[in-house]
Amino acid sequence: MAKKEKKAKVATITTKSGESLKVFEELNDFETFLRGEVEDNEFDHVHCKAKYYPPFVLHESHDDPEKIKDTNNSHNKKFVRHLHQHVEKHLLKDIREMFQNPDLKFKNKSKEETFEKITWHYADESELNAKKFRIQLDVTCTHDGAMVDVDYRTEPIAAQEPVI
């Protein structure tokens, strides 16, 4: 019996500004999409989002979203610590590997914390196939659940005109 092929869970929404935006429900689908954009050489002008449960949360609940504890949210120090480790050691590392650029360090980091949510901002500039681009990643967790929002954006950097 053949294995049933899993279809990517993605929705395309239109923002208020008229931008078409892909929203992924699983981290693997999000990463597969980004790899495809890099392979197609269309990586320098991408904006997409992912809303997913982090792997460590799913592992804890035996891959059953119904069993995820209500305490897994931005008010839980252990959850926040594990999420930050997941982002730094896995998500950013995977993006670095996609672009085959070990120098992509996301040096511009910041953290924004309110009662409702915690957002980590990462940004850096890179070059691939003679295209310079800026990459920005915002990772948000809220006080009302374990779902994580990732906002991924790349934009080209205009080539500097020669000084005469």
From Swiss-Prot:
Subcellular location: Cytoplasm
Biological processes, Gene Ontology terms: energy reserve metabolic process
One cellular component term from this protein's GO annotations in UniProt: cytoplasm
Gene3D superfamilies: Respiratory growth induced protein 1 (3.40.1000.40)
InterPro entries: RGI1, RGI1_sf
Chief place of localization: cytoplasm
Keywords linked to the UniProt accession: Cytoplasm
Function per UniProt: Involved in the control of energetic metabolism and significantly contribute to cell fitness, especially under respiratory growth conditions.
The family this protein is said to belong to: Belongs to the RGI1 family.
Protein name per Swiss-Prot or TrEMBL: Respiratory growth induced protein 2
Species per Swiss-Prot/TrEMBL record: Candida glabrata (strain ATCC 2001 / BCRC 20586 / JCM 3761 / NBRC 0622 / NRRL Y-65 / CBS 138)
